[in-house]
Amino acid sequence: MGILWDSFLLLLVSTFALFLVRILLFKTGLIYMVKLWRRKIIDWFHVYQFYKVPEFNDNVQENHLYQKVYMYLNSLSSIENSDFTNLFTGKKSNEIILRLDRNQVVGDEFLGARVCWINGEDEDGARNFVLKIRKADKRRILGSYLQHIHTVSDELEQRNTELKLFINVGIDDHLNKKKKKNGRWRSIPFDHPCTFDNIAMETDLKNKVKSDLESFLKGKQYYNRLGRVWKRSYLLYGPSGTGKSSFVAAMANFLDYDVYDIDLSKVVDDSDLKMLLLQTRGKSVIVIEDLDRHLSTKSTAVNLSGILNFTDSILSSCTADERIMVFTMTGKEQIDPAMLRPGRVDVHIHFPLCDFTAFKTLANNYLGVKEHKLFSQVEGIFQNGASLSPAEIGELMIANRNSPTRALKHVINALQTDGDRRGTGRRLLLENGSRKSTSEDVSDDMSGSLCGGGGGSSPAVKEFRKLYGLLRIKSSRKSGSFDVAREMRDG
């Protein structure tokens, strides 16, 4: 009986001790250490193989597999079990998104086999993912597992309709190597509300631009048959505030493309620009704004020929297909027409100051007004030559959006001020012209009396011939330029 009692007490004490050990393990980090030791012991009995997926290939172009692995891993529930995970706010304020941190491990299972992914980073800052898989499982699951990643990431990409705006960063000397390895693009969500439905533009021109873009979207086989790169380029030119940037946003929303906004002030030279363009993805709109301003101020070592040569050079065939390139300028008169020939720039679209048709579109968009008793007065002022940019008129309407009548009166006052300014300018020009012509007449009379005739060789006639020759040169240059926007309007 005593032996049984002793055995019972020993069992009771052992059970209590195990219970205390269990509590100790779960309440402290010892359980983590036990799991870690267990994993290391198992690893001693298995041979593993490692596969690295770098973010960029040897040509510094984006590795699409890296992006697919990135999307796939961040969708795994096991990311919560990683030792270090980043938390971000999602689209909704109460939504929390988990992202794997650098040099952290996340586990996954496929067809009964366990694999691990390491979010790595090399010494030079190049990012990568490393797949750790048992050699015994490699032949059985590797191919189908990678295909599984492709399938899941494609489904995630289709559900994620968020567009992105990519911005290039500059090269700092102490981070030169690292930034080149990591890429020079940084992205933010692109949610610009502008569309072709609410943009102020002539209806016929808008419809023809939309038709041109739709033809481009369906043109992959056509471009391949012609042996041309599947891309298209646009030149948008006109004064500031006429809607060029809004038009780019409308294009991106219509095409459902990401946007790459190139800041030339952060580009070192033509070679650096080419490397930037090589790192862009397909299905994107690549924008270089205010091109003439950058070139005139010499704020960058990039030149116009270097930019436009890329669009029709052999190197452009090495980049992703299905891209739209857009250049914006305030005017193209100072640009050599050969620089803007077809093949380099396919479509030229002029953005003029606001006219009455565009004004009615703005009034409808900003004020919800399609007709108003003051419209006839506004139309008359436009017909007299007054004009403002759509941005200026839009700001007046926003400031007075609670009262359409007050907003229209402010627009009328601004237009009248502009008309008076233009009228004063024309009068001064006419007065200066009449004074100049009078002085030239006196000069001709004096030269005739002194030289005994010979009016054909007088300085005034020479100046007139020189001016006439200059006008002929400018006229010939203008007639030789290729402007699809004008063709669209005439057609």
UniProtKB/Swiss-Prot annotation:
It is found in: Membrane. Its EC number is 3.6.1.-. Residues 423-460 are annotated as: Disordered. InterPro entries: AAA+_ATPase, AAA_N_dom, ATPase_AAA_core, Mitochondrial_chaperone_BCS1, P-loop_NTPase. It is a single-pass membrane protein. Keywords: ATP-binding, Hydrolase, Magnesium, Membrane, Nucleotide-binding, Transmembrane, Transmembrane helix. It comes from the Eukaryota. CDD domains: RecA-like_BCS1. Gene3D superfamilies: 6.10.280.40, P-loop containing nucleotide triphosphate hydrolases. ATP binds at G238, P239, S240, G241, T242, G243, K244, S245. One of its GO terms (biological process) is response to stress. It is an enzyme of class 3 (hydrolase). The chain crosses the membrane at residues 1-21. It catalyses: ATP + H2O = ADP + phosphate + H(+). GO terms for cellular component: membrane. Its cofactor is Mg(2+). Belongs to the AAA ATPase family. BCS1 subfamily. This is AAA-ATPase At2g46620. It comes from Arabidopsis thaliana (Mouse-ear cress).
